[in-house]
Structures are given as C-alpha cells and as structure tokens.
A protein has these predicted regions:
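A C-terminal-region feature
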Residues: 1-139
C-alpha cells in the first residue's frame, strides 16, 4: 500500500477500460523484480501475470483478451468503448469486488477519469486492509 511520504516501488505501464491497472514490479509487489502485475478491479489485489514486459506486450497485442476480460463485457461493450476517451475508465456499481457473482450486465456503470479511479482504488484497498488488520487485534 502507498501512503503519504512513501514511494510506490512499481511502474504503472497500462490501465484498462474496466478499471484494472498493469504494473512493472520494482519490489513493491513481490520478489520477482521486473515481473508484470495486474491490479484487478474485482479483487482490489495485485495479481502476478507470471511474465515480464516483452511477454506482456505480446499478450496485449496477440493474446486472448476475450478470455481475460470475459467477466467485464456486456452486450454492446465494443460499440460503447469505441466512443470512450482513452483517459477514462468504467466505474461499476455495485463495485466489481463486491457481489462477485453479480453479472456485469446487472451493474450500473459510468466513466470517470483514470487518475480518480486509481486514487479511489488505493483508498478502498487501504480501508479494507486496515479493517482486516483491525479484526486481528485482540479485544
């Protein structure tokens, strides 16, 4: 987690329209320096993609994106995203990390600036992490 005065030891290299972020690990996310991680909007956790930058680029250009994004595609998504500004991402309600069994078709969505979404994700992740650690404290 990043807090005021700390440096995030990873380099954000991409984001996606569903609100996920891709990062090159600089030590923040695991021991695999140079590994690529995905901040998943459905878990609010960094997940290793078990690849490095060149593998990520190959996947982004030639990989099975339909499989990767199958849970965040809705009827008409392609046409809707074609009109979208590249500085925006979708924010879903209920959030994707809540009610995970709920289809994306049944969620409302709006576009928001990617930097606001990044800040929101970090804040939510921080709050959830603090709640979990508070649960571990003795009464």
């Amino acid at each position: 987690l990043v807090t005021a005065g700390q440096t995030f030891q990873a380099l954000l290299i991409a984001d996606d329209a569903s609100g996920g972020f891709f990062a090159l690990n600089g030590g923040e996310l695991g021991k695999d320096l140079g590994g690529i991680y995905y901040f998943a909007p459905d878990t609010l956790e960094w997940e290793s993609l078990d690849t490095h930058y060149s593998g990520f680029m190959h996947w982004a250009l030639c990989g099975d994106l339909d499989l990767f994004y199958k849970n965040v595609r809705w009827t008409g998504w392609r046409e809707e995203m074609a009109l979208m500004n590249c500085n925006l991402v979708y924010s879903f309600y209920p959030f994707l990390w809540t009610e995970q069994q709920l289809s994306v078709e049944k969620r409302s969505r709006v576009t928001i600036p990617v930097e606001k979404h990044w800040a929101l994700c970090l804040d939510l992740q921080h709050q959830l992490t603090n709640m979990q650690s508070d649960d571990l404290l003795p009464p």
